[in-house]
Amino acid sequence: MQYIKMVICGDGAVGKTSLLIAFASGEFPRDYQPTVFDNFSTLYMFQNKAYNLGLFDTAGQEDFDRLRPLGYNDTDLFLICYSVINPPSYANVYDKWYSEIKLYTGSEIPLILVGTQNDLRHDKATRETLALKQQAPISYEEGMMMRKRIGAKAFTECSVVSGKNVKQVFEEAIKVYQDRQIEISKSKEKNNCIIL
């Protein structure tokens, strides 16, 4: 069985833990509990193959900036999350999370961009609250622009409350992992030489 280590990053309260719990257990957690560091392991069948997904949840709060990168070792891919109703979390995708990952991994670990809470994008009360701060929800097109900016291999929006695209986030991640393994194999084959 193939093991895949996925680390989920993003600002606090954007729904990272809720996304992991909803995927692993099918339940929506109602209470917000700030995460320091947690991990889940779940078995998942995808395209008739079993995967052991190591899902590593990280703290988004600034207090854990020095602790968080310790969990980045041996990561197969990163999911960077922002909330579509939290514009600062979107800005931090590049300013904080992309920069931190590149600084501490220094490698070509694939990135998946995830826009959370998209069920609230058209919610009247949410839009009014954002308007009071002279802000608006992040559009899908803005998400696509950020995907290009950080070189993410995939971009998905989801809603844990409605369940929309929760599985798709992780299926996209598995596809990206599969593609990366093929690239690595081809690269190794290319670099093999035979001396006669």
UniProtKB/Swiss-Prot annotation:
Gene Ontology biological process terms, A to Z: actin filament organization; cortical cytoskeleton organization; establishment or maintenance of cell polarity; mitotic cytokinesis; regulation of actin cytoskeleton organization; regulation of cell shape; sexual reproduction; signal transduction
Any GO MF annotation of the entry: GTP binding
Lineage top rank: taxon: Eukaryota
Matches recorded under InterPro entries: P-loop_NTPase, Small_GTP-bd, Small_GTPase, Small_GTPase_Rho
Sites bearing Cysteine methyl ester, chain numbering: 193
Lipid tethering residues (S-geranylgeranyl cysteine): 193
SMART domains named in the record: RAB, RAS, RHO
Propeptide section residues: 194-196
Keyword Membrane: yes
Membrane topology term: Lipid-anchor
Keywords tagged on the record: Cell membrane, GTP-binding, Lipoprotein, Membrane, Methylation, Nucleotide-binding, Prenylation
Subcellular location: Cell membrane
Binding residues annotated for GTP, in chain numbering: 10-17, 57-61, 116-119
GO cellular component terms given for this protein: cell projection; cytoplasmic vesicle; cytoskeleton; plasma membrane
Record keyword Membrane present: yes
Span of the annotated motif Effector region: 32-40
A Pfam family: Ras
Family: Belongs to the small GTPase superfamily. Rho family.
Protein name, per record: Rho-related protein racL
Originating organism: Dictyostelium discoideum (Social amoeba)
